Amino acid sequence: MIKHQFKLSDPRLLSRIGYQFKQLELLQLALTHRSVSHKYNYERLEFLGDSLLGMIIANYLYHAYPNENEGRLTRMRATLVRQEALGKIATDLQLSRCLILSTGELKSGGHHRESILADTVEAIIGAIYLDSGDLNLLKDIVLKWYIPYLDHIEPTDQLKDPKSRLQEYLQARKKPLPVYEVVDIQGDAPHQHFKVECVVDGLPKIYGEGSSRRFAEQAAAAEILKLLEQ
């Protein structure tokens, strides 16, 4: 049950977010993982925040890049709203210390799991919108979070997803394509957590995790690319 006398474990979170909640229980809900409660958790707020974030970023890109076509704008948006980008936002906001997790989830490292942190960012976006009812205010807050990343986004082919980039990298060097295999699935559908192994000739096995097989494969491919680009 959501507490009406909720106290943040880190009061400075509000300052980092850049918004003072009138209904603090909405922020509490946005920070609460389903391992704590199947009914009172961030998943509905995440659903709302995901749509709002996509709209905010799409609107920004539409006006910032008037000469780019739909395909490139789509890739740019995907780069800015994917799990990896949201994980960086979560790190900037220092969300890991504020998550409300079950004891088991906490012990398993859930407070550092990128998928949980990314979901929480989207849930906070949904919570701010419901609390303020002000889309323009929400847009300003979200774009402030993205300031360190917007200046570095470019409409190039590098904005392809990690799996596509890894495949092109290997094909260009006439090397075998990567092999992906699911090695672990936790939870029940539709709230599962996947762990995927990625094997590339000449490199150690790399693992990626995510809320779907696709996200886990992308995470693994991103780690392989980091190794190859060193």
From Swiss-Prot:
Documented EC number(s): 3.1.26.3
InterPro entries: dsRBD_dom, RNase_III, RNase_III_dom, RNase_III_sf
Keywords for the protein's UniProt record, in alphabetical order: Cytoplasm, Endonuclease, Hydrolase, Magnesium, Metal-binding, mRNA processing, Nuclease, RNA-binding, rRNA processing, rRNA-binding, tRNA processing
Residues reported to bind Mg(2+): 46, 119, 122
Catalytic activity: Endonucleolytic cleavage to 5'-phosphomonoester
Domain RNase III, residue spans: 10-133
Alphabetical GO biological process terms: mRNA processing; regulation of gene expression; rRNA processing; tRNA processing
MF terms (GO), sorted A to Z: double-stranded RNA binding; metal ion binding; ribonuclease III activity; rRNA binding
Cofactors (names): Mg(2+)
Gene3D superfamilies registered for this protein in UniProt: 3.30.160.20, Ribonuclease III domain
Gene Ontology cellular component list: cytoplasm
Positions of the catalytic residues: 50, 122
Segments forming domain DRBM: 161-230
Cellular localisation: Cytoplasm
SMART domains in the record: DSRM, RIBOc
Signal peptide residue numbers: none
Family of this protein: Belongs to the ribonuclease III family.
Quaternary structure and interacting proteins, as annotated: Homodimer.
PANTHER family: RIBONUCLEASE 3, RIBONUCLEASE III
Protein function: Digests double-stranded RNA. Involved in the processing of primary rRNA transcript to yield the immediate precursors to the large and small rRNAs (23S and 16S). Processes some mRNAs, and tRNAs when they are encoded in the rRNA operon. Processes pre-crRNA and tracrRNA of type II CRISPR loci if present in the organism.
Name assigned to this protein: Ribonuclease 3
Origin species: Acinetobacter pittii (strain PHEA-2)
Gene transcribed to yield this protein: rnc
